[in-house]
From Swiss-Prot:
Keywords: Chloroplast, Membrane, NAD, NADP, Plastid, Plastoquinone, Quinone, Thylakoid, Translocase, Transport. NDH is composed of at least 16 different subunits, 5 of which are encoded in the nucleus. Its main location: plastid. It is a peripheral membrane protein. Belongs to the complex I 49 kDa subunit family. It is found in: Plastid, Chloroplast thylakoid membrane. This is NAD(P)H-quinone oxidoreductase subunit H, chloroplastic. NDH shuttles electrons from NAD(P)H:plastoquinone, via FMN and iron-sulfur (Fe-S) centers, to quinones in the photosynthetic chain and possibly in a chloroplast respiratory chain. The immediate electron acceptor for the enzyme in this species is believed to be plastoquinone. Couples the redox reaction to proton translocation, and thus conserves the redox energy in a proton gradient. The keyword RNA-binding does not apply. The gene is ndhH. Its EC number is 7.1.1.-. It catalyses: a plastoquinone + NADH + (n+1) H(+)(in) = a plastoquinol + NAD(+) + n H(+)(out); a plastoquinone + NADPH + (n+1) H(+)(in) = a plastoquinol + NADP(+) + n H(+)(out).
Length: 393
């Protein structure tokens, strides 16, 4: 990094990679003029594990456990994008029941990710109380994950053509109870945080990104929607069954850290709406053991219908990826998570390029922190929402 040529004595400060507010092993080399930030250079790569190269030497079913280590706080999305590519290449249909369950799991994962963004973000700017509140709600989400998948994190639940297992008995009722409970807690967050004058002083007008600037930088997710661009891939691409539910894109015009907070808080409420609709309209209803009911051909022949299955005809472990190129994407909690996939008539992908939202969104950080105070770095970095496992891959 070049030192600015000025007559002032500048100070160069290392932040990270072990700083608690870095949200992983991120290092920032910050040039300061007193308390004012003159320059900032992010140093990445401390958590690089060669995830793209590993994909080229694994079949898709072998690679699935690896992808949950990208964004380890929203693992359902990395699994979804990993199976969506081969499904499109092989023209594999997903049963409607499996698609609905996928939507439920994705939105629960979105809520868990936003919750674990909110707590540390508030702690970064000096508010400790919400940090403990969000873990209370997050535990309920992880209990639902554990009951359905067997794991609190790193679920390995998605499969090509469906999901690994149907929902256990009583899971739907527990999830509906959580939805009713969580809506009241969001109101509590708004009372505790949104109207707090100290919080507003720290985030209002800090880290402003205009709509055109956000597009030029390639930002996505809450970073883009908080800048006045109502762009959400769930509406644009209509993947899974999102077009069958009633919900609204949450966006703000201000483009500052407060706007990004408001977008994420509103998104959690919209996710609850989607989950409630998916649970109430789940093909096959609340009776979960549909696989055994399918054998009872005399009384209920309709249970053999394709839409009631949780997984379609399973592809073989040597499932070949046809010789073509494909880009697939999903709306992850942090933005557009995409994969550029090149098949080569082999069980292994010839190229597996990951487009992580955190890596793209992080590029604007040096521009946002210039001419700001040193203390504002934590606010701006926290509002971007990054996970270094996804950034470095």
């Amino acid at each position: 990094m070049k030192r600015p040529v000025t007559g002032k004595d500048l100070m160069i400060v290392n932040m990270g990679p072990h700083h608690p507010s870095m949200h992983g092993v991120l290092r920032l080399i910050v040039t300061l003029d007193g308390e004012d930030v003159v320059d900032c250079e992010p140093i990445l790569g401390y958590l690089h594990r060669g995830m793209e190269k590993i994909a080229e030497n694994r079949a898709i079913i072998q690679y699935l456990p690896y992808v949950t280590r990208w964004d380890y706080l929203a693992t359902m999305f990395t699994e979804a994008i990993t199976v969506n590519g081969p499904e499109q290449l092989g023209n594999i249909q997903v049963p409607k029941r499996a698609s609905y369950i996928r939507v439920i799991m994705l939105e629960l994962s979105r809520i868990a990710s936003h919750l674990l963004w909110l707590g540390p973000f508030m702690a970064d700017i000096g508010a400790q109380t919400p940090f403990f509140y969000i873990f209370r709600e997050r535990e309920f989400v992880y209990d639902l994950f554990e009951a359905a998948t067997g794991m609190r994190m790193m679920h390995n639940f998605f499969r090509i053509g469906g999901i690994a297992a149907d929902l256990p008995y009583g899971w739907i009722d527990k999830c509906l109870d959580f939805c009713d409970y969580f809506l009241t807690e969001v109101v509590e967050y708004q009372k505790l945080i949104t109207r707090n004058p100290i919080f507003l002083e720290r985030v209002e007008g800090v880290g402003i990104v205009g709509g055109e600037e956000a597009i030029n930088w390639g930002l996505s997710g809450p970073m883009l929607r908080a800048s006045g661009i109502p762009w959400d891939l769930r509406k644009v691409d209509r993947y899974e069954s999102y077009d069958e539910f009633e919900w609204e894109i949450q966006w703000q015009k201000q483009g500052d850290s407060l706007a990004r907070y408001l977008v994420r808080l509103s998104e959690m409420t919209e996710s609850i709406k989607i989950i409630q609709q998916a649970l109430e309209g789940l093909p096959g209803g609340p009776y979960e053991n549909l696989e055994s009911r399918g054998f009872d051909r005399k009384r209920n022949p309709e249970w053999n219908d394709f839409e009631y299955r949780f997984i379609s005809k399973k592809p073989s472990p040597t499932f070949e990826l046809s010789k073509q190129e494909l880009y697939v994407r999903v709306e992850a909690p942090k933005g557009e998570l995409g994969i550029f996939l090149i098949g080569d008539q082999s069980g292994f992908p010839w190229r597996w390029k990951i487009r992580p939202p955190g890596f793209i969104n992080l590029q604007i950080l040096p521009e946002l922190v210039k001419r700001m105070k040193l203390a504002d770095i934590m606010t701006i970095l926290g509002s971007i929402d990054i996970i270094m496992g996804e950034v470095d891959r």
